[in-house]
């Protein structure tokens, strides 16, 4: 028997439970993501983050509705490839790197510090989706420029990051510092002139 959930007089059929608080659901042949919150503060932070990210220009799954009483939200279900998984095969397409720099630029301009690690992004339909729905107050770009940006290229920092997550990657594919710095410099000039 198919389990159904009703939110604001709309019925959704549960297709799959993704984790403890997330479900893939379907309504009228379209897939959605149902997120349940058990903590009121976390739900309010999600609602605030969803709004701030949406108006900033950072692409994230569209939120169709949320129920403040139940602390549930219905979002677009994004099927695509996680950028960390894409990078494990060697390198990311230039289009993905362009979109990554744009996401950082939008965040910086709206004073939002988002977690720029590649496993927080999914590439689908020509868009780069930021999945966590979290942000901090932006103070400066040094952490991204000197740290996280190197995780978007096949660098020794990327290999170390993967190993810290228990992911085995081929260290022989590591790009030279010269090649990585050249790519970073070219992308930076393109977006920050």
Name these PLM-found stretches.
Residues 24-25, 36, 65, 74-77, ...:
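Conserved hydrophobic "DFG−1" position in protein kinase catalytic cores
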Residues 116-121:
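Hydrophobic residue at the +6 position relative to the catalytic HRD Asp in the kinase catalytic loop
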Residues 8-47:
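ATP-binding glycine-rich loop module of kinase domains
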Residues 99-106:
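Conserved hydrophobic core/spine positions of the Hanks-type protein kinase catalytic domain
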Residues 32, 59, 73, 129-131:
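Protein kinase-like catalytic core scaffold
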Residues 49-59:
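Structural motif at the C-terminus of the N-lobe alphaC helix and the adjacent alphaC-beta4 loop
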Residues 58-99:
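Conserved structural core of kinase catalytic domains
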Residues 109-112, 124-193:
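C-lobe/activation-segment region of protein kinase-like
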């Amino acid at each position: 028997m198919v389990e159904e959930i009703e939110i604001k007089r709309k019925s959704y059929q549960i297709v799959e439970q993704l984790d403890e608080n997330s479900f893939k659901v379907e309504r009228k042949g379209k897939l959605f993501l149902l997120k349940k919150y058990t903590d009121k503060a976390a739900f309010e932070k999600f609602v605030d983050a969803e709004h701030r990210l949406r108006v900033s220009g950072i692409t994230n799954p569209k939120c169709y509705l949320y129920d403040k009483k139940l602390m549930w939200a219905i979002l677009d279900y994004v099927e695509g490839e996680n950028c960390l998984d894409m990078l494990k095969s060697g390198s990311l397409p230039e289009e993905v790197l362009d979109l990554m720099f744009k996401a950082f630029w939008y965040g910086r301009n709206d004073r939002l510090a988002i977690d720029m690690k590649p496993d927080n992004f999914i590439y689908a339909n020509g868009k780069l989706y930021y999945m966590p729905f979290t942000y901090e107050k932006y103070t400066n770009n040094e952490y991204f420029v000197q740290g996280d940006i190197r995780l978007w290229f096949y660098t020794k920092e990327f290999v170390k990051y993967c190993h810290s997550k228990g992911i085995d990657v081929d260290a022989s594919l590591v790009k030279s510092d010269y090649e990585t710095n050249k790519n970073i410099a070219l992308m930076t000039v393109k977006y920050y002139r």
